[in-house]
Swiss-Prot record:
GO molecular function: proton-transporting ATP synthase activity, rotational mechanism
PROSITE patterns for this protein: ATPASE_DELTA
NCBIfam families: ATP_synt_delta
Protein name: ATP synthase subunit delta
Protein family per UniProt: Belongs to the ATPase delta chain family.
Function: F(1)F(0) ATP synthase produces ATP from ADP in the presence of a proton or sodium gradient. F-type ATPases consist of two structural domains, F(1) containing the extramembraneous catalytic core and F(0) containing the membrane proton channel, linked together by a central stalk and a peripheral stalk. During catalysis, ATP synthesis in the catalytic domain of F(1) is coupled via a rotary mechanism of the central stalk subunits to proton translocation. This protein is part of the stalk that links CF(0) to CF(1). It either transmits conformational changes from CF(0) to CF(1) or is implicated in proton conduction.
Principal location listed in the UniProt entry: membrane
Species this protein is from: Gloeothece citriformis (strain PCC 7424)
Gene: atpH
ATP-binding found in the keyword field: no
Gene3D superfamilies according to UniProt: N-terminal domain of the delta subunit of the F1F0-ATP synthase
GO annotations of cellular component type: plasma membrane-derived thylakoid membrane; proton-transporting ATP synthase complex
Length: 184
């Protein structure tokens, strides 16, 4: 259900409502930080994701867990929004709502999301180099990097910006050489 159009159709109005609340209270960046933390938690804890999306578990239990997870440092508006998702039985779409909110935030701040796959973890200098390259390619004011590691690349990086892919990996270069030699 993660990428289905139905889940997007359900998540989008909630994300827009949250964006509207955050804009009217000048909390867009703060909500963005809290939502990124929540997404990290959901991505690193399949148990939590399953717990929240399980229709058999009572709403009170889900609310209690969310209250504990979010703590007092989370803005009350965002906590109340999460409780609303539980009440409306839409908490199973939390991940999609969060992703959609971040997409709206990037659009608002002229920020582009760049998914970077590298053979090893990028150091600060390499990250900055990738950010500069993405800014040049996209014309965006800011870049949000989503980095992952794939040792099969051997070296280099693959950068995905929207539907555009820049393959600067050794594996990609070897594949292109293989294709050109195969055509001879």
């Amino acid at each position: 259900m993660k990428g289905s159009s139905l889940s997007l159709e359900i998540a989008e109005p909630y994300a827009q409502a949250l964006m509207s609340v955050s804009q009217s209270n000048n909390l867009t960046e703060r909500f963005g930080e809290d939502i990124r933390s929540l997404l990290d938690l959901l991505n690193n804890s399949p148990e939590l994701r399953e717990f929240l999306s399980n229709p058999v578990i009572r709403e009170e239990n889900k609310k209690e867990i969310l209250q504990r997870i979010m703590g007092d440092q989370t803005h009350p508006y965002l906590r109340n929004f999460l409780m609303l998702l539980v009440d409306k039985r839409r908490i199973a779409f939390l991940e999609q709502v969060c992703e959609q909110y971040l997409a709206l935030l990037r659009q608002l701040t002229n920020t582009v999301l760049a998914e970077v796959v590298s053979a090893t973890e990028l150091n600060d200098e390499q990250r900055q180099s990738v950010i500069d390259k993405v800014k040049t390619i996209s014309g965006a004011q800011a870049v949000e990097l989503k980095a992952s590691i794939n040792p099969d690349l051997i070296g280099g990086v693959i950068i995905k910006i929207g539907s555009q892919i820049l393959d600067a990996s050794i594996r990609g270069q070897l594949r292109r050489i293989s294709l050109s030699l195969g055509g001879v």
